[in-house]
Amino acid sequence: MINIRFPDGSIREFEAGVNSLDVAKSISPSLAKATMAAYIDDQLKDAKDAINSNCELRLITVKDPEGLEILRHSCAHLLAHAVKELYPNTEVTIGPVVDNGFYYDFSFKESIGEADLPTIEKKMKELAKKSAPISYRVVPKAEAIEFFKAQGENYKVEIIDSIADEQMKIYTQDNFSDLCRGPHIPNTSVLKAFKLTKLAGAYWRGNSDNEMLTRIYGTCWATKEDLEQYLNMLEEAEKRDHRKIGKVLDLFHFQEDSPGIAFWHDNGVRIWRQVEDYMRASNNKYGCSEIRTPLIADFSLWQKSGHASKYAENMFATKSENRDFAIRPMNCPTCVQVYNTKLHSYRDLPIRMAEFGIVHRNEPSGSLHGLLRVRSFTQDDGHIFCTPEQVEEEVILMVQQCFEVYKDFGFNDFAVKIALRPENRIGDDETWDKSEQMLKNALDANNVSYELLPGEGAFYGPKIEFHLKDAIGRSWQCGTIQLDFSMPQRLGATYIDKNGEKQVPVMLHRAIVGSLERFIGMLIEHYAGNLPLWLAPVQVAVMGISNNQDDYCKEVFIMLEKNGIRAKLDLRNEKIGFKIREHTLLRVPYLVILGKNEQEQKIITIRKHSGEDLGQMSVDDFCAFLDKQIQAKE
């Protein structure tokens, strides 16, 4: 007999060889039905793995994040199973879990398109209903190679060759087998709420020299209700797509002459200026001086900073006068050069610098996505040089600034996470202990709850991440606060301490909105293009019922502009209904409509974008009304 301890501290006795599914059944049939896998002494295992000794057991159900991930991973296998049934000559490659779903890459021998997805999905449902048990066997590497080679799965053979382990896991359901670390669900009947969503191309191992594979994306959920809710969200997201809205509102465009780099139009630049000016004022409030540094630097600087070894493939390089240069992928090294121009005392610290720095990264063309994934973007970078004793206080201020910014832009629901030390890192454990505790203390001081992400920090320091939730429930990673013990030392940054000796400052990297391009894309989708008044590219459209009001329209327009209102004058010889409809589609917050009565009484009639009639008032009163709304960031 063995003793199994449960999360509530209770201990129960079972026969040796029992599995987690049996344990779940002994508690309740419903729990057994919901069990996906289990943690046995902190190791994630299949639900049917035998337990032969005393242990601590935590059952994983579909309600747990790990359970949902396992469900989705098993659904990826179901997709591969269905594809092999329908297209037997297809080679399977990899099928990982991604946010809200999964994908699987295939090498098809025949042409396949979006129209084929319903057929594949139908086959998946047929296979799931078979309730085929899912099991695995562990075999020597050579045997696994022979197994997949015999099936003509050359990609699987290549994957196995690249793995150092001498033992391989092969999972089987019905007549389909796949290489996988697992764990997986007990049987296919659990898979009831899934949907194939799209098809795309993807190079094998992300290398454009390799074969272009077909990537099929899908989503999978614990219940059909959850699936329906997610699909509704996708439908709403499609309506909010910033690329479509950007075209309608004449904000920006992309073209093949400059892939991944936006062409900003007047309306888009107006939004950009509001975001940048707001951030500049926020930085001034928090004591940041503003700098501007070169986009191009000698390649030796990137070698010193470490970017050459880690980012070389993503950097744009050029030559001039027999020298190698690179366009910067990050702003940090050039910021350090500004710091290094002076001798600093500990009394000078902290030194806070901010920069709206343009960076370029050679992202794969297949990953580019409107403003959300580009090759050139402007980062609202901040870099703080301080003593170790000042770190906590500086982080407290940065957290406060982040919260203020997000709330002013209309993001009131966000999650905060701390990425902790990775396995490969610089610095001793004592330094990491102190650093991680400083970040925790800073969040505690702001009464912020947070999630810990073990192993996800950078090799040079832990970081705080801010994840914003938008109007339709999507989460966007936005700001970061990063401790850095490496770059100041690599680039020779120093200060003189109170004993007259040189010390290396701690460098804090902070980005609040991050990429301005991406943040504006987020704002467009969050508000579905109906930006709040203070951000709207055109705040008021002025129009007359007939051309008899043209002079008065011009007069009102000039008064609005003198009061700092971004107004548009529409004197076209069109019916008033047409003008109202057009400016409503353009998401202009307020429409000023002028007729004979308004002209004679020197008043204006105001209509909101929503269609609400605000009645009549003087231009001065309207300007005061708008100013109050703008100042309140409404």
UniProtKB/Swiss-Prot annotation:
Pfam families hit by this protein: HGTP_anticodon, TGS, tRNA-synt_2b, tRNA_SAD
Subcellular location: Cytoplasm
Binding site for Zn(2+): 332, 383, 509
Keywords, sorted A to Z: Aminoacyl-tRNA synthetase, ATP-binding, Cytoplasm, Ligase, Metal-binding, Nucleotide-binding, Protein biosynthesis, RNA-binding, tRNA-binding, Zinc
Reactions accelerated catalytically: tRNA(Thr) + L-threonine + ATP = L-threonyl-tRNA(Thr) + AMP + diphosphate + H(+)
Source organism, top-level taxon: Bacteria
GO terms for biological process, alphabetical: threonyl-tRNA aminoacylation
GO cellular component: cytoplasm
Chloroplast in keyword set: no
Main location as per UniProt: cytoplasm
Stretches for region Catalytic: 241-532
Cofactor comment: Binds 1 zinc ion per subunit.
Metal-binding in keyword set: yes
Function: Catalyzes the attachment of threonine to tRNA(Thr) in a two-step reaction: L-threonine is first activated by ATP to form Thr-AMP and then transferred to the acceptor end of tRNA(Thr). Also edits incorrectly charged L-seryl-tRNA(Thr).
Quaternary organization: Homodimer.
Family: Belongs to the class-II aminoacyl-tRNA synthetase family.
Cross-referenced NCBIfam families: thrS
The protein's name in its UniProt record: Threonine--tRNA ligase
Originating gene: thrS
